[in-house]
Each structure stands twice: as C-alpha cells, then as structure tokens.
Design a protein with these regions (language model features):
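An N-terminal assembly and electron-transfer interface module characteristic of large anaerobic redox
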Residues: 1-293
Length: 293
C-alpha cells in the first residue's frame, strides 16, 4: 500500500504555512505588501498612487472599503467581453487567468479570452512584454476589432511590464493597456472604472483630434449619460422620467460599443448612478461635462 495514506489512522488535515515568507522569484504570487513594494520598485508608483487616491479603502473616505470576494480584474474583464468588436488579452499567472475566464463564462461571456503566458525567465528578461506585443500585433485586425484591451494582473504589474509601450494603436486598432492588480484595486467594481476611464480618455483625445464615428442612435433632445452598470430596462425607465424635463437617456457607461463612448461624452450632463467611477468622472470633467449624483 502507498505510504501516502497512513494505515495507523493518525491522519492530520493539510495545512498551508501562511507565514513561510513570500517567494521572491519565479513569478509566484505573494502578499499584497510584497507585491505592492515590488510594483513600486518596478516603476508603477504613479499608477498605484492614482488608484489609492481614486479608491481609498478607509471606510470614512468613501465606498471602496468593501470585502473582496474575488479577483478585481473580473470587473474590467467583464466590461471588455460585453463590448462589440473588442478583444481582450490577459497577462498573469495561469491560475488567475483560469479563474477569471471560468467566472466570465459562468456569467454568460461568449468570447474568447486571449492569454499570454510567462515563465520566471520571460518575466525577468523582459521577454514577456515582447510576447504580449507579438500577440497583440497578430490579433490587431481592423476588419474584426475596434479595440484590444490588454490587462496586466498582479505578477506582471509587480514586475513592471510596461503596457504603455505598446502604443496607442496597432494596424489601426486601438490598444488599451491597463494594470489591474489585486493589491491596488479594492474590488471588481473599481476595476470597471479603471477600464471605462481609460477608454473615455482615449475617446476624448480622438474627439479633440477630429471627426469620429456617429452613434447608431441619436436623440434630438439633450442627453443624460448614465454612469454605472445597470439592468437593460433601467435606461428605458429613466428615459421616461427624463422626457417631461425635455431630456433623454444617453448611453450607459461602461458602454457596449466603442462609438458609444463618443455619444457618452457628447451629453448635457452625466448622472453618476454608482459611486465607484472616479476615473470616469475625471474624464467627463475634463470634457467639460457637469456631474450630478
């Protein structure tokens, strides 16, 4: 009989030693403090400082001090998977990517999620960034996609993988690179704002540069952009309440299509339905749009 199962009946439950110390090499996951320190050392201080300012976890400072029930990157992943003509690529530990893709498909996603694997060697030498760039270049087909969202999870963020060096566009396809580490984003609600804010920033710069694609539907009335995810029937009901005021419900941010971002920016006012969208509010304010709520 195998020695793996003792025959004397003295079995003890398996336990993981949580105080064994963080693994400092090989791309392994570590404690939040260790990962945060590594990310700052790798040049990500500006991003972490912005997240800390946008999403303070002090309960007295705002609504972001919530128990984290799952990887926050699920929020941004779900937003990307719901958008038309948008591809999503993840860079992170295989176990993290598996959990995120499993959860996203459990919630009804019917899109393929791109994944760029790494090893300790590719992480340390910088080859991971080259692999990401090669993958995005192969995926960037303007016939199929308006945008490609590339997301760094914990380990690539802590290692300083510079998604900003991918550029703004490849083959005419917009590239949105974001860092969504579990040690910097409180919950998946804030991660939705990270992506929505990044896309609004890109779209706002496009509008400033020249003509952009018209929305599929346009109201003759001034519109109210609705900031925060909601059920499909909610904008209809809100629109009925706005009609007597001479207003119409505009796009819901996060949007379902890239061109809706332009319509969202072209509004009379923004109604902040949810309290988590700090980065998005910053972009609307930069566009000169008043915020209510």
């Amino acid at each position: 009989m195998s020695d793996a199962f003792p025959t004397n009946g003295n079995r003890a439950p398996d336990r993981i030693d949580l105080d064994a110390g963080a693994v400092k090499s090989g791309g392994a996951c570590s404690s939040k403090d260790t990962m945060r320190e590594a990310a700052r050392t790798a040049g990500k201080s500006d991003i972490l400082d912005q997240y800390a300012a946008d999403y303070p976890v002090d309960a007295a400072a705002g609504p972001h001090d919530q128990p984290q029930s799952m990887c926050p990157a699920f929020g941004s992943l779900r937003v990307g998977l719901r958008m038309r003509r948008t591809a999503t690529v993840l860079s992170g530990s295989a176990c993290c990517v598996y959990g995120l893709t499993f959860t996203s498909h459990f919630y009804g996603a019917r899109r393929t999620v791109g994944y760029v694997p790494f090893s300790s060697e590719t992480l340390v030498t910088g080859k991971l960034f080259e692999d990401i760039k090669e993958a995005v270049e192969g995926l960037a087909d303007p016939e199929n996609y308006d945008a490609i969202i590339v997301t760094n999870l914990c380990v690539p963020t802590a290692s300083g993988v510079p998604l900003r060096l991918l550029g703004k566009a490849i083959n005419g396809v917009r590239i949105i690179g974001i860092d969504v580490p579990g040690f910097g984003i409180p919950t998946h609600a804030e991660a939705k704002d990270v992506l929505a804010g990044a896309m609004l920033n890109y779209a706002r710069e496009e509008v400033a540069a020249g003509p952009v694609a018209a929305p599929r539907e346009r109201s003759d009335l001034p519109t109210v952009t609705l900031l925060g995810e909601m059920f499909p029937a909610d904008p209809v009901v809100i629109g009925q309440m706005l009609a007597p005021l001479g207003l119409a419900a505009g796009p819901v941010v996060p949007t379902r299509e890239w061109r809706e971002l332009y319509a969202a920016l072209d509004c009379a006012v923004v109604a902040a339905i949810h309290p988590f969208y700090t980065a998005s509010i910053r972009e609307f304010e930069a566009a000169g749009r008043p915020i209510i709520g």
